[in-house]
């Protein structure tokens, strides 16, 4: 703590000696990080292929969603593990009530406010909550890293901004820039080609392998972008905001939100906050009996996308092999009392 206080004092004295300075390091100075622009396009394209592949797989592999909580299950019959925490769960002994799931239940991404100018106006206030659009956080991260979308315009600078006594000042004149239009066309064209190549595949196993590859490609690319571009999450609720600062919209309803007047408690986000993995129970035998509540300590888990692709024929990834507990042999239901 003493070192942090000393560093803060030194930075304050440096600002007094040089009140007007040009920010040099992107993206803090309003410019893009050149080496991350192609990564952003790869992440965006991988997300489009992922959604296309999952939409095909859910037509063959059923997805079950609890009516009262966020529990998800991949399989023809929902599991019998009593973990429901939704309304009326006490009357049902925490048993889930299953309904048919959708694509966005498998690939869930929280929404984030879209920032037109991430440096000049990095924060959305409460009165602007109805006017500023909310888009998936992974898409907003790609836009801030260099992806240009016609539906969600953003300001691109060619000169760095200045900091005058801690305030960001932009001396660049506003002018129309049409350099991004060909890039939009190229992006749409490449995405269409990827979707067409995906649609031409009829083998379920090939679709599952391609879908899982796009999942890992999206995750790895997003991690690289998050090293430079800030992503914040609330410490009490799942709200996510992509940008250097968190928004001021009073919408938090988690623990002690009354003491914070509904404001979020922002902290640095991880990849799981940006792209929720949504862990589900791993089913070894899709044609067997439902997962038993008494045997839940013998079952493993995996992200919903991974479990869906594995049941469709994709090989089990090495990084999730131990989590799925493939080396554990669960006993039969009549052998529970005989196992230590």
Language model regions located:
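Cys/His-rich zinc-coordinating modules
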Residues: 1-56, 92-239, 245-340
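Core mature regions of organelle-targeted
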Residues: 39-42, 54-68, 84
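N-terminal helical oligomerization/adaptor modules that nucleate signalosome assembly
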Residues: 60, 70-75, 81, 95
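Short Cys/His-rich zinc-binding micro-motifs
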Residues: 64-77, 231-245
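Short Cys/His-based metal-binding microdomains
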Residues: 78, 88-90
């Amino acid at each position: 703590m003493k070192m942090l206080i000393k560093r803060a004092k030194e930075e304050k004295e440096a600002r007094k000696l040089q009140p007007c300075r040009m920010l040099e390091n992107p993206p803090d100075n309003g410019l893009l990080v050149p080496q991350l622009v192609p990564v952003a396009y790869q992440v965006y394209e991988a997300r489009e292929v992922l959604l296309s592949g999952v939409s095909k797989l859910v037509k063959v592999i059923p997805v079950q969603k609890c009516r009262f909580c966020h529990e998800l299950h991949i399989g023809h019959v929902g599991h019998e593990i009593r973990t429901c925490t939704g309304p009326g769960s006490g009357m049902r002994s925490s048993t889930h009530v299953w309904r048919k799931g959708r694509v966005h239940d498998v690939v869930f991404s929280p929404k984030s406010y879209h920032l037109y100018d991430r440096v000049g106006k990095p924060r959305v206030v409460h009165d602007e909550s109805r006017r500023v659009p909310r888009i998936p956080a992974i898409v907003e991260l790609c836009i801030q890293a260099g992806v240009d979308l016609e539906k969600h315009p953003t300001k691109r600078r060619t000169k760095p901004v200045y900091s005058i006594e801690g305030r960001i000042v932009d001396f660049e004149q506003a002018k129309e820039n049409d350099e991004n239009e060909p890039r939009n066309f190229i992006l749409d064209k490449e995405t269409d080609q990827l979707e067409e190549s995906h649609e031409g595949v009829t083998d379920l196993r090939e679709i599952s392998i391609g879908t899982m590859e796009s999942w890992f490609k999206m995750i790895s690319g997003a991690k690289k972008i998050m090293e430079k571009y800030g992503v914040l999450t609330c410490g009490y609720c799942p709200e996510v905001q992509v940008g250097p600062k968190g928004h001021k919209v009073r919408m938090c309803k988690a623990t002690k939100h009354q003491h914070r007047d509904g404001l979020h408690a922002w902290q640095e986000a991880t990849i799981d906050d940006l792209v929720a993995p949504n862990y589900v129970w791993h089913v070894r035998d899709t044609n067997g009996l439902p997962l038993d509540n008494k045997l839940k300590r013998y079952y493993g888990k995996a992200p919903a996308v991974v479990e869906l692709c594995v049941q469709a024929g994709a090989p089990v990834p090495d990084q999730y092999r131990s989590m799925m507990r493939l080396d554990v042999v669960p006993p039969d239901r009549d052998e529970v009392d005989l196992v230590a």
